Amino acid sequence: PHIGRTNRWLAPIGAVDLDGDGAVEVAYIDRPHLAKTLRVWRFKDGALVPVADLPGLTNHRIGETDIGGGIRDCGQGPEMITASADWSRVMATTLTDGQLSTRDVGRHVDRSSFTTALDCEPL
């Protein structure tokens, strides 16, 4: 999706059927240093269509060499793992009936916090 200006980018979270409807959704953070918005899109009828947005989340900081977080399934369906916009918390977000809901899963300390969350371990 177009985000407007040069030198702006998207930080992928992953692509999987997030809501159990059989269609694959694509999740990413729109401009992780500026907009800090989780966006979910679905490929439908030959085009990408927006599904849901949720502000206040991010997965990359200026100077980092990788993108943190990802998608996990701890037995109750896929969850997108990101950080809160201020990097204080690790967040798990689900897609249900076209709506995103997020919950705090623990304190963000460093990159190992993402690894722990993705491994379904408590923080």
State where each predicted segment sits.
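Beta-propeller-forming repeat regions
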Residues: 1-123
